[in-house]
Amino acid sequence: MIPLLFILFYFANGIEWHKFETSEEIISTYLLDDVLYTGVNGAVYTFSNNKLNKTGLTNNNYITTSIKVEDADKDTLVCGTNNGNPKCWKIDGSDDPKHRGRGYAPYQNSKVTIISYNECVLSDINISKEGIKRWRRFDGPCGYDLYTADNVIPKDGLRGAFVDKDGTYDKVYILFTDTIGSKRIVKIPYIAQMCLNDEGGPSSLSSHRWSTFLKVELECDIDGRSYRQIIHSRTIKTDNDTILYVFFDSPYSKSALCTYSMNTIKQSFSTSKLEGYTKQLPSPAPGICLPAGKVVSHTTFEVIEKYNVLDDIIKPLSNQPIFEGPSGVKWFDIKEKENEHREYRIYFIKENSIYSFDTKSKQTRSSQVDARLFSVMVTSKPLFIADIGIGVGMPQMKKILKM
């Protein structure tokens, strides 16, 4: 078994390997300002300008989070489990007394979703050891700490989170797959919205609850196949819209990538009826962002607590996936092609296979490497991150196929 850090891979020019100093298990990867941060147990590696650096931290400390908090110091933080006592450090390894570890890293090694926007930090990380999975706003100047209600967020967490403008207000959007039923399991993919500067509920018991949480189902169907398990998501901003890319898995031995217009999604949140609600909507309507200092009425909060699902289904652009791929896809990223506005190359990985889909030619190419792939991050060139090499000697790229 060969310890690896990642692969610099080009379909045209082959492969280049960069190795860990010691055998490591990759815990997390983040790309911040074109710097790759790779969290392992007890350390974080950074890679930029073809240079690899390691910062050692405490032992028994799974680094799950690398995040740039946009406060006055504009520090990049790395946060980990720290032997069951979550903690954050600056990238040079020094202590960071300004940011508590809870909410930035879990108590035990697990997959996390965390974002920072205008100094506000949000995550699906439990702040107590036995806590229920929730989506929280827990640090920064956006207002009180807020969290979702019980069982709104699935136990395995989110598959994407981002902030986007809706008129003059910032809204945070999250993606997840809900599982319904006990005898016949049904999976429903959702995108949910909340106002970033939500003031919380109107009573002392609800003041730390999101008061603008609404969700709507996403559709990704073709030829009778319905893709419903969200793997991963990305957004691309255009001149007048934000395009949401969502990779789905399915029971059909296939996966699919669907794209959605955020303008369409925002319109649905603004105008759609609430599923199961038949009365006239209160004022302000559920999900509407209010000016600073304004709190929703008791009536509005009661409605959104009981009826937070839209009576609508968001269809993808062109009413079908961009393409279908193999099942078991783990991660993907997107790169705009040089000198070709709004044409992209989409990279995705499965086990030890690498794929590239060209949105212009509609061709998919694939290759295999002697390594277990962890994730893919696109900078000026795609970085394919692997945590284990298989066999003896440096792993090789096996083949390139057109599909």
From Swiss-Prot:
Gene3D superfamilies associated with the record: YVTN repeat-like/Quinoprotein amine dehydrogenase
Subcellular location as annotated: Secreted
InterPro entries assigned to the protein according to its UniProt record, in alphabetical order: Semap_dom (IPR001627), Semap_dom_sf (IPR036352), Semaphorin (IPR027231), WD40/YVTN_repeat-like_dom_sf (IPR015943)
Entry keyword annotation includes Cell cycle: no
GO molecular function: chemorepellent activity; integrin binding; semaphorin receptor binding
Signal peptide location: 1-14
SMART domains cross-referenced by the UniProt entry: Sema
Domain Sema: 15-403
One family name in Pfam for this protein: Sema
Gene Ontology cellular-component annotations: extracellular region; plasma membrane
GO biological process: integrin-mediated signaling pathway; positive regulation of cell migration; regulation of inflammatory response; semaphorin-plexin signaling pathway
Assigned keywords, A-Z: Secreted, Signal
Stated family: Belongs to the semaphorin family.
Quaternary structure (record): Interacts with host VESPR.
Function of the protein: Acts as a semaphorin-like protein and binds to host plexin C1 receptor. May alter the movement of host plexin C1-expressing cells including dendritic cells, monocytes, or granulocytes in the proximity of infected cells. May also regulate host cell cytoskeleton of neighboring cells to improve viral infection.
UniProt xrefs under PANTHER family: SEMAPHORIN, SEMAPHORIN-7A
Entry protein name: Semaphorin-like protein A39
Species this protein is from: Vaccinia virus (strain Copenhagen) (VACV)
